[in-house]
Amino acid sequence: MPKIGNIILPDFPLLLAPMEDVSDPPFRRLCKLHGADLMYSEFISSEGLIRDAMKSKQKLDIFDYERPVGIQIFGGDEEAMEMSSRIVDAVQPDLVDINFG
C-alpha cells in the first residue's frame, strides 16, 4: 500500500490534483462521493495569502469529510512561502504541497 507520511492509501489510489477554479469544496465533495482517496484544494498563491486576499483565504476551506486532504501553495519568494505555509498550517490540512518556482 502506498504511504505518504502517516496517510495509508489503497494499492491503486484515486487522487484529485490541485486545479485552479476546479477543485473547490463542492467538486471535492463529488469526487469523495465517487471514491477519491486523497484530494487537494485549488492551488493557492502564497502572495495572496500573506496579503489576506479574500479569494486566497476562501481556498483554505477544508472539511472533515474530505480527509485526507492537502493544500498546495505556490510562489517564487522564499519569505512569502514561509509566511503562507504558517497560515496554511493553521487550518490543519493532512498534507501541504509546495510549488516553488
Predicted feature residues:
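Glycine-rich, positively charged N-terminal anion/phosphate-binding segment
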Residues: 1-5, 19-94
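Extreme N-terminal starter segment of soluble prokaryotic enzymes
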Residues: 1-2, 10-14
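Short, flexible active-site-proximal loops enriched in glycine and acidic residues
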Residues: 93-101
